[in-house]
Amino acid sequence: MATGSYFPPPGAPSSISPRNSTPALSPLSPPLQQRSNALSNRLTSVLSVSYADSDIRDALETLSLRGVHNTAEVRRQLRLDVQKEVVDCNAEIVRDFGNVAEQLKRIGSVISSLKETCDEMRKHIVLAKQDTTPVLEEASALMIQKQEAETKQRLLDAFTKHFIVSEEELLALTSIEEPIDDEFFDVLARVKQVHRDCEALLGAEHERLGLELMEKSSRSLNSAYQKLYRWIQKEFKSLNLEDPQISGTIRQALRVLAERPSLFQTCLDFFAEARDYVLSDAFHYALTDAVSGGDSAVKPIEFSAHDPLRYIGDMLAWVHSTTVSEREALETLFVAEGDELAKGIQAGLNSEPWSRIDEDEEMTFDGQKALSDLVSRDLIGVARSLRQRVELVIQGHDDPVTCYKVINLLSFYQTIFSKLVGPNSNLAELLKALEKFTLNHFQTIMRDEVNNISTDHSALAPPDDLSAPQFLHDSLEVLTALMKTHEASLGTEDPSITSESEENEFTPVLHAALDPFFTLAKASADELPDPTARAIYLTNVHITTRSTISPYPFATSTHLPPLSATLSTLRVELLESQHRYLLDTSGLQVLLTALQPFSQSNESGTEKDLAAIADLPAFQAEALISTSQQLDDFLPSALMDATDNLKRVQSATFVKSVTEEAVEAFCRDFEFVEGMIIGADEARGVGQSDGAVNEEGEEGDGDGDGEVELELEVEQRGQGQSLRKLFPRTTGEIRVLLS
C-alpha cells in the first residue's frame, strides 16, 4: 500500500488564503454597516484568541515548517490547499485500510483452516487419551510399587549390613581353628554392637525379630568369649613375663575378656597358680641351685644360712626384687593401655548385677588394688617358703641383738611391701607376723637369761665396790647395741614425737631387755645390811642405767622419769647420811640434841629460857671445850673425809652436789648453835661484858690486866663463864674451812 504525507511539503504553494486576507466584495454582501459590525466582531474574535494555546502554537509551528510565504494568493488558497491535503491523506488512509481488510480476510481464512485442523487433532487426542489412560494408570502403579520395593530393599540391605553377621565372620569369631587376631576383635565388636542395638528392636514393633537376633548374638558372644578364654589360658602357659615385648594381642584379649568378670576371674586364678608355681621354683633355685646356672659369682642364698641377718636379708631382697619385677610385668600386661581394662571390668560388673553380694551396694573396680592382690597371689608359695625358713633360722639362734636386727629388717621390708602391694596384702601380713614371731623369740631369750641369772646367787651378790652388778652391765651393753640398731633403722621416731607420747616402738624392747635385769639389780641390794651402802649401790645401778639410755630419746621417754625420781629419793638418803656424818664427826650433834627444846620453832622464848642453856650438861665448860676441840680437829679434813665417805658412788658430780648440800645443811645447824650460844650469853648478861672486854682488850696495851679483873668481877657477881669464849668458832669460819 502506497504511503504518502498527509500535508504538502514546506514551500509548496497553498490555495488557502490567510484568515486576515481581505475578502472580495460581492454584490450579494450585506450592507456596509453590517460589514463594519462583522469586521468588528471578527477583529474582536481574533484579538480574543490566546496564541499561548498549545494547539495554536503547534499550528503555527506546522505552518512555519511548510515555508509558506505571506502573499494574497497563498492566503486565499491556504484553506483549500489544506483541505485538499486532508482529503488526499484520508484517501490514502482508506486505501491502506482496504489493503488491511484484504489481509485480514486472508488471515481469517487461515485461522478457520487452523481451527478445523485443531478440532481434528483434538478428536485424535481424545481418542488417544482414551486408549492410553489405562496404560498410564498401570504404569503409575508400577512406579509406586517400584519405589516401595527399592525402599524396602534399601532397608533390608541396611538391616542386613547392621544386624546380620555373615557366616565367614561367625566362623572367624567362634571357630577354634581360626586364630585370635584383629579380625576376631573386629567381628566381636560388631556382634556386641548388634546385641546392644537389638534393644531398639525390642522397644519397637519388631519384638520377635529383636528377640531372635539378640538370642543369636548372645550365643555368638558366649562362644567367642569361651574361645578367647581358652586361648588366653593357653597363652598363659607359655607366657614369659620377663620378656619386655609382651604380645599386644594378649593384652587386648585380656581387656575384652574383662567384660566377662567370671571368665576373667577364672583366667586370673589360673594365671596366679601358674605364676605361683614359676616363682616358687625360681625362689627354690635362688636358695639352693644358683651355682648350677653357670654364674659362679652368684652363690645360693643357703650359703649364708649361718648368718641369720644376711640370710633373711638376702631372701627378703630376692622377694622384693621379684615383687617389683612381677608388678611391673603385670602393669605392662594389664594396665599398659590406660584404664581400658578397668572400664571393661566395670562394664562387666554392671552387666552382671546378680554377681553382687549386696544388691544395694554399687561395685566399683579398683585397678591398683586388683593388681596388688594379683601380685600377692602370685607370691603365695614364695611367702609360705619364706615364712618356714625365717622361723626356722630364728628359732636356731639365741643372740638377742641379731634377733632385734632381724626385727628391724622385717619392719623395714614390711613398710616397703605395704607401699608396694598394700598394707593388707599377704606379704605385708606375713612380714608383720614374722616380726611378731621374732619379737616373741627375742623376749623368750631375755626371759631365759633373766631366769638363769635369778638362780645364780653369786651373780646377784653386789660387788665389793658397790658398783652396778656385772649382769646389769652385760644387759646394758646388749641394750646399747639394740638402741643403736633402732636409731639407725627406718622406724626410728622423731624425738619431738617420742617426748609427747610415752609409748613407742622401742618400749616393748625396753620391757624385755632392761626392766627384768634392772629389777634383779635393785632386788640384790637387799643383801646389803648398811643403809648407806645400799643407797650407794642403788645409786650406782640407777646412774649406770640412766647414762646408758640418756642419748636415746625413744628410751628416755618411757624410762628416764622413773629413774630420775628414784635417783632423787636416793640422793636425799645420801644427803641425810652425809649430814649425819658431819654432825657426828664434828661433835655438833651433841649440842643440837641438847638444844632440841630450844629449836627454831621456840625462838620466841624468854631470856630466862635462853639463860638456862648454860645449865645444860653439854654446855658446861669442860664438855663445851671438848666439843670445840673435836670441831677444830674435824674441820681441816672435813670436806675430804665427807667426799671420801661417798667415793664408791660412780659419779663425781653426784658426790660433789650431795656433799655440798650436806655441808650447807651442817653450816645452817652450826649457825643455829652459834645463835643459841650468843643468845644464852646475852640472856645472862655475859655477852655484853665479853663485848666490853673485847673492845677494851682491843684498845688496851695487850697486857690482859683488865680482862682478868673483869673475869673476877663477873665471878663475884655469880654470872658464870661466857659460852662464846668456850666455843669461839663462827659460821663464817666454818663456811670458809668447808668450802
Swiss-Prot record:
Signal peptide: none
Recorded superkingdom: Eukaryota
Membrane topology summary: Peripheral membrane protein
Record's compositionally biased regions (Acidic residues): 693-706
Keyword Ribonucleoprotein carried by entry: no
InterPro entries: COG6, COG6_C, COG6_N
Keyword Lipoprotein in record: no
GO biological process: intra-Golgi vesicle-mediated transport; protein transport
Compartments where found: Golgi apparatus membrane
Disordered: annotated segments: 1-35, 686-706
GO cellular component labels: Golgi membrane; Golgi transport complex
Record keywords: Golgi apparatus, Membrane, Protein transport, Transport
Entry's family note: Belongs to the COG6 family.
Described function: Acts as a component of the peripheral membrane COG complex that is involved in intra-Golgi protein trafficking. COG is located at the cis-Golgi, and regulates tethering of retrograde intra-Golgi vesicles and possibly a number of other membrane trafficking events.
Protein name: Conserved oligomeric Golgi complex subunit 6
Organism: Emericella nidulans (strain FGSC A4 / ATCC 38163 / CBS 112.46 / NRRL 194 / M139)
Lineage: Eukaryota, Fungi, Dikarya, Ascomycota, Pezizomycotina
